[in-house]
A protein has these predicted regions:
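Surface loops and adjacent helix of pleckstrin homology
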Residues: 19, 52, 88
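Short, compact, well-ordered microdomains
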Residues: 60-90
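Acidic, low-complexity, intrinsically disordered interaction modules
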Residues: 35-70
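Broad, structure-driven detector of short, well-ordered beta-strand segments within folded domains
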Residues: 7, 25-30, 35-45, 72-80
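Amphipathic alpha-helical packing elements
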Residues: 1-24, 33
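Charged, low-complexity surface segments at secondary-structure and domain boundaries
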Residues: 13, 44-46, 90
Length: 90
Protein backbone atom coordinates (compact mmCIF):
# COMPACT_ATOMS: atom_id res chain seq x y z
CA UNK A 1 0.00 0.00 0.00
CA UNK A 2 1.19 3.50 -0.72
CA UNK A 3 0.64 6.81 0.93
CA UNK A 4 -0.38 9.83 -1.07
CA UNK A 5 1.52 13.01 -0.45
CA UNK A 6 -0.01 15.75 -2.52
CA UNK A 7 -1.55 16.76 -5.81
CA UNK A 8 -0.39 19.72 -7.88
CA UNK A 9 -2.93 21.31 -10.19
CA UNK A 10 -2.25 24.02 -12.73
CA UNK A 11 -3.81 27.45 -12.14
CA UNK A 12 -6.59 26.23 -9.86
CA UNK A 13 -7.39 26.33 -6.16
CA UNK A 14 -7.47 22.74 -4.94
CA UNK A 15 -7.28 21.11 -1.54
CA UNK A 16 -6.65 17.57 -0.39
CA UNK A 17 -9.15 15.90 1.93
CA UNK A 18 -8.01 15.31 5.50
CA UNK A 19 -7.71 11.56 5.07
CA UNK A 20 -6.95 9.37 2.08
CA UNK A 21 -8.27 5.81 1.81
CA UNK A 22 -5.88 2.98 1.01
CA UNK A 23 -8.12 1.92 -1.87
CA UNK A 24 -6.87 4.64 -4.19
CA UNK A 25 -5.93 8.26 -4.69
CA UNK A 26 -8.64 10.69 -3.67
CA UNK A 27 -8.56 14.46 -3.84
CA UNK A 28 -11.04 17.30 -3.85
CA UNK A 29 -11.37 20.48 -5.86
CA UNK A 30 -12.74 23.71 -4.48
CA UNK A 31 -14.05 26.32 -6.87
CA UNK A 32 -14.30 30.06 -6.24
CA UNK A 33 -17.84 29.62 -4.94
CA UNK A 34 -16.64 27.24 -2.24
CA UNK A 35 -18.17 24.18 -3.87
CA UNK A 36 -16.28 20.90 -3.63
CA UNK A 37 -15.86 18.14 -6.16
CA UNK A 38 -14.13 14.81 -5.60
CA UNK A 39 -12.08 12.69 -7.97
CA UNK A 40 -10.80 9.17 -7.35
CA UNK A 41 -8.09 7.28 -9.21
CA UNK A 42 -7.95 3.62 -8.19
CA UNK A 43 -4.73 1.63 -8.02
CA UNK A 44 -5.54 0.02 -11.36
CA UNK A 45 -5.61 3.47 -12.95
CA UNK A 46 -9.36 3.61 -13.43
CA UNK A 47 -10.98 6.98 -12.86
CA UNK A 48 -14.15 7.76 -10.95
CA UNK A 49 -15.41 11.30 -11.43
CA UNK A 50 -18.51 13.31 -10.71
CA UNK A 51 -20.35 15.64 -13.07
CA UNK A 52 -18.21 18.66 -12.21
CA UNK A 53 -15.20 17.10 -13.94
CA UNK A 54 -17.16 16.75 -17.16
CA UNK A 55 -17.17 20.56 -17.38
CA UNK A 56 -13.42 20.71 -17.88
CA UNK A 57 -12.37 20.89 -21.50
CA UNK A 58 -8.57 20.71 -21.63
CA UNK A 59 -6.57 20.37 -18.43
CA UNK A 60 -3.44 18.63 -17.23
CA UNK A 61 -2.69 17.79 -13.62
CA UNK A 62 -0.02 16.00 -11.66
CA UNK A 63 -0.27 13.69 -8.68
CA UNK A 64 2.29 11.83 -6.63
CA UNK A 65 2.37 8.57 -4.73
CA UNK A 66 4.97 6.93 -2.52
CA UNK A 67 5.01 3.14 -2.73
CA UNK A 68 7.57 1.15 -0.75
CA UNK A 69 9.63 4.30 -0.26
CA UNK A 70 9.72 5.17 -3.97
CA UNK A 71 8.18 8.42 -5.23
CA UNK A 72 6.11 8.14 -8.39
CA UNK A 73 4.84 11.16 -10.32
CA UNK A 74 1.94 10.89 -12.74
CA UNK A 75 0.44 13.32 -15.22
CA UNK A 76 -3.19 13.08 -16.25
CA UNK A 77 -4.65 14.63 -19.40
CA UNK A 78 -8.22 15.71 -20.05
CA UNK A 79 -9.27 16.63 -23.59
CA UNK A 80 -12.77 17.77 -24.39
CA UNK A 81 -13.75 17.05 -20.81
CA UNK A 82 -12.66 13.39 -21.04
CA UNK A 83 -9.66 11.82 -19.35
CA UNK A 84 -7.51 10.65 -22.24
CA UNK A 85 -4.45 9.23 -20.48
CA UNK A 86 -2.41 8.99 -17.31
CA UNK A 87 1.34 8.69 -17.73
CA UNK A 88 4.30 8.27 -15.43
CA UNK A 89 6.61 11.29 -15.39
CA UNK A 90 10.20 10.05 -15.54
Amino acid sequence: MGCYDYVRFENKDYVLPDSLPVAGIVFQTKDLGGNFSTIVIDHDGSLVMDDMWKLFQDIEFYFYTVVDGVLYEYKAFFQGGVLTKIEVVL
